[in-house]
């Protein structure tokens, strides 16, 4: 019945147009790819923070778990935004408008720069939890960035130890305290300009990561 009727262009086999099978790239070079990767990371952090806020409101996470998770996300947000901030993106509000990111709860946390569980007094348990999480991440990030001089590591490590001491809920034999104490002893035997060698950095990262995981297990117990 339809014999002899030619196929309408665009209505038939896409095999006649090999360009339809070509990968569409958002970037033209490595620099552009890194830019989009950085924006995607920031987008993901904000969305995750929004989800965490909703979970806390619905009592799906405990206050301690929420405080630790939110504190980590705030640290990650600051690092991610620094990678994106520039002539195209000057503020997080501008980023959210540009990419239609509707996360009001996350934006409130970002602007207050602290979990909702934290009050202003330094003795508050949630304040201590947030500080411990932030200090663990800060020290580990410094080591990963090859910042390894004694006078650049010891102050944060000492503050981490002091903050853990203020947490009366932590058991006296908590392994994180012992780990930090041992490294403080190592650093105390060094001069200000001395640097940790590669082996020490690797071991310290392993020890602090283990201590940080132990701290999170304690919060979930």
UniProtKB/Swiss-Prot annotation:
Alphabetized UniProt keyword annotations: Acetylation, Cell membrane, Endosome, Membrane, Protein transport, Transport
Membrane-related topology note: Peripheral membrane protein
Disulphide bridges, residue numbers: none
SUPFAM superfamilies xref list: Endosomal sorting complex assembly domain, VPS28 C-terminal domain-like
Principal location class: membrane
Domain VPS28 N-terminal: 13-120
One GO CC annotation: cytoplasm
Residue stretches making up the VPS28 C-terminal domain: 124-220
Assembly: Component of the ESCRT-I complex (endosomal sorting complex required for transport I) which consists of TSG101, VPS28, a VPS37 protein (VPS37A to -D) and MVB12A or MVB12B in a 1:1:1:1 stoichiometry. Interacts with TSG101, VPS37B, VPS37C, MVB12A and MVB12B. Component of an ESCRT-I complex (endosomal sorting complex required for transport I) which consists of TSG101, VPS28, VPS37A and UBAP1 in a 1:1:1:1 stoichiometry. Interacts with VPS36; the interaction mediates the association with the ESCRT-II complex. Interacts with SNF8 and VPS25. Interacts with CEP55.
Task of the protein: Component of the ESCRT-I complex, a regulator of vesicular trafficking process.
Protein name: Vacuolar protein sorting-associated protein 28 homolog
Species: Bos taurus (Bovine)
